[in-house]
């Protein structure tokens, strides 16, 4: 069960991302982290459509942090094919640390701007 702190953090993050994406008109890079895998997708909230996605389930398993970085690079490559350069990073309720940070850094190296 989620604690009150986790719920408040999640709501605070959702509110901030919602206002940021609406104000800037940028697409949203959303991250979901499970115990085994990490998933990332670029979403156009105005149309409710996923434009590019990548996950560690399709990649070779190994070190989780290295796999997260590979997902970030794969997502950046998929975004570059579709001409996407600027996004808003939506880490959800996850702290910007470890696998989430590795994915973000690799996506930046791949050419995404956030």
UniProtKB/Swiss-Prot annotation:
Q: Does the keyword Ribosomal protein apply?
A: yes
From what superkingdom does this record's organism come?
Answer: Bacteria
DNA-binding is among the record's keywords: no
List the GO cellular component terms. Answer: cytosolic large ribosomal subunit
Q: Which GO terms describe its molecular function?
A: 5S rRNA binding; structural constituent of ribosome
Q: Which InterPro entries does this entry report, sorted A to Z?
A: Ribosomal_uL18_bac-type, Ribosomal_uL18_bac/euk
- Give the record's keywords alphabetically: Ribonucleoprotein, Ribosomal protein, RNA-binding, rRNA-binding
Q: Could you provide one GO biological process annotation from this protein's UniProt record?
A: translation
Q: Do you know which HAMAP family this protein is assigned to?
A: Ribosomal_uL18_B
Record-stated family: Belongs to the universal ribosomal protein uL18 family.
Q: How does it assemble?
A: Part of the 50S ribosomal subunit; part of the 5S rRNA/L5/L18/L25 subcomplex. Contacts the 23S rRNA. Contacts protein L27 and the 5S rRNA.
What is the stated purpose of this protein? This is one of the proteins that bind and probably mediate the attachment of the 5S RNA into the large ribosomal subunit, where it forms part of the central protuberance.
Q: What is this protein called?
A: Large ribosomal subunit protein uL18
Quote the gene name from the UniProt entry.
rplR
């Amino acid at each position: 069960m989620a604690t009150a702190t986790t719920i408040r953090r999640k709501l605070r993050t959702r509110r901030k991302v919602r206002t940021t994406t609406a104000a800037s008109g940028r697409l949203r890079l959303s991250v979901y982290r499970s115990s085994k895998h990490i998933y990332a997708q670029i979403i156009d909230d105005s149309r409710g459509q996923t434009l590019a996605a990548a996950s560690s389930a399709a990649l070779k398993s190994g070190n989780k942090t290295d796999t997260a970085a590979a997902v970030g690079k794969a997502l950046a490559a998929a975004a570059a094919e579709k001409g996407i350069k600027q996004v808003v990073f939506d880490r959800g309720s996850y702290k910007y640390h470890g696998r989430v940070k590795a994915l973000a850094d690799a996506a930046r190296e791949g050419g995404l701007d956030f």
